[in-house]
Amino acid sequence: MTLITPPFPTNRLRRMRRTEALRDLAQENRLSVKDLIWPIFITDVPGADVEISSMPGVVRRTMDGALKAAEGSRDAGHSRDLPVPLTDPAVKTETCEMAWQPDNFTNRVIAAMKQAVPEVAIMTDIALDPYNANGHDGLVRDGILLNDETTEALVKMALAQAAAGADILGPSDMMDGRVGAIRQAMEAAGHKDIAILSYAAKYASAFYGPFRDAVGASSALKGDKKTYQMNPANSAEALRNVARDIAEGADMVMVKPGMPYLDIVRQVKDAFGMPTYAYQVSGEYAMLMAAVQNGWLNHDKVMLESLMAFRRAGCDGVLTYFAPAAAKLIGA
């Protein structure tokens, strides 16, 4: 696009900023409640259904709390929820069998949500870390994370979530080939209409800390995740990952984290034109909330500005812990 800008005073850019009505006419991007996906922390661990200290205003929810949250999502108009489990350490193992049990707590919550509030689209997180004794997203042997064996486990996990009623599967593990394996398994099992939102460009970021506290993975994690999550210095690699996942059957793609990687969002959207999402992760949320609590930033203004940045960068939607608060301000 070639920009043609007449010289001043023929062109006075402030003309279209003079009143709110004129500013609205010139506004290029808009934020809607339909752009929001709400990650909800869930737990059946006794006494764990409390506010998460590193994420002010965010709580872990029992089954009843999760169902009320889904009802709230429907009523507010952001009818897309992602239940994320805090798993009892007693059931975590290095083989992660609980991840694909049909009656694990996550799958029970998915089924109950779909029965109680069928209008809400349920997205899932497919990775082994909530069930892994060593805190990793995949199976580990002799200090090495096993790609192909992990993919087999993720397929079983995806099938169990699909059977429970999930609408969108979200493989977040960053194993090579897992999107294709999950897509083939869905077709073979008759789940041809279940969508895959691939965490295609997930970086080995320092912004995940509060999330790992929320799901009890911080103390369990042995080492780091740099052998499977992306180097924060890389951008061309993100495009290769996205291209591969689209070819393997992803219906939507995600960049994670969000705000520090909006350049990646823009590149992905421009290159592929696919439905593109980003995750405003726990560290981003905690950073803004800490400034709000100290009186340094205005909660509502900084929340909406941060979410608008995702839309301006090319996101079709945002996974954000701000979803309920943002929905109240935006309105249906």
Curated annotation (Swiss-Prot):
Superkingdom classification of source: Bacteria
Gene Ontology CC terms, in alphabetical order: cytosol
Protein keywords: Heme biosynthesis, Lyase, Porphyrin biosynthesis
Subunit structure: Homohexamer.
Top class in the EC scheme: lyase
Primary role: Catalyzes an early step in the biosynthesis of tetrapyrroles. Binds two molecules of 5-aminolevulinate per subunit, each at a distinct site, and catalyzes their condensation to form porphobilinogen.
UniProt keyword Nucleotide-binding, yes or no: no
Name of the molecule in the record: Delta-aminolevulinic acid dehydratase
Enzyme Commission no: 4.2.1.24
Binding of 5-aminolevulinate 2, residues: 282, 321
Organism: Rhodobacter capsulatus
Molecular-function annotations in GO: porphobilinogen synthase activity; zinc ion binding
One BP annotation, GO: protoporphyrinogen IX biosynthetic process
Miscellaneous notes: Does not seem to have a metal requirement for activity.
Bilayer-crossing regions: none
Pfam families attached to this UniProt entry: ALAD (PF00490)
Enzyme active site: 202, 256
Keyword Disulfide bond among record annotations: no
SMART domains, A to Z: ALAD
Catalytic activity: 2 5-aminolevulinate = porphobilinogen + 2 H2O + H(+)
UniProt binding sites for 5-aminolevulinate 1: 212, 225
Protein family according to the UniProt entry: Belongs to the ALAD family.
Pathway: Porphyrin-containing compound metabolism; protoporphyrin-IX biosynthesis; coproporphyrinogen-III from 5-aminolevulinate: step 1/4
